[in-house]
């Protein structure tokens, strides 16, 4: 069945039993493959819940702009979720962030502001 909305795929990731990581035969280890989220990260779930909860509480509404300091996967996930929910987002990153991260955030529609790396994220 094809999902109606990509947001419905977040957290709906496979659970796999690991047979080689645990030596104790009385232990059953299950691994949740969060890398199978639409954005490829465990951060997708957190980003979705932060934005969806803020919308539900009325803390933000469509048309508002979110501003977040980030250095990686959370920013990518926030950019993706904001785009899917039609919310503008501005992400502040240190200038030494990888080109791939900043390009991905921009590809999702985020405005990316780079700050001097030596000062960190302010």
Placement of each model-derived feature along the sequence:
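PLP-dependent amino-acid enzyme catalytic core
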Residues: 1-122
């Amino acid at each position: 069945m094809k999902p109606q909305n990509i947001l419905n795929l977040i957290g709906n990731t496979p659970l796999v039993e690991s047979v080689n990581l645990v030596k104790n035969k009385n232990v059953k280890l299950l691994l949740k493959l969060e890398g199978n989220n639409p954005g490829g990260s465990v951060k997708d779930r957190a980003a979705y819940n932060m934005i969806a909860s803020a919308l539900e509480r009325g803390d933000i509404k469509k048309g508002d702009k979110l501003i977040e300091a980030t250095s990686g996967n959370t920013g990518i996930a926030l950019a993706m979720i904001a785009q899917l929910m039609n919310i503008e987002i501005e992400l502040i990153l240190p200038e030494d962030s990888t080109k791939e991260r900043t390009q991905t955030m921009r590809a999702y529609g985020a405005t990316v502001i780079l700050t001097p790396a030596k000062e960190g994220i302010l």
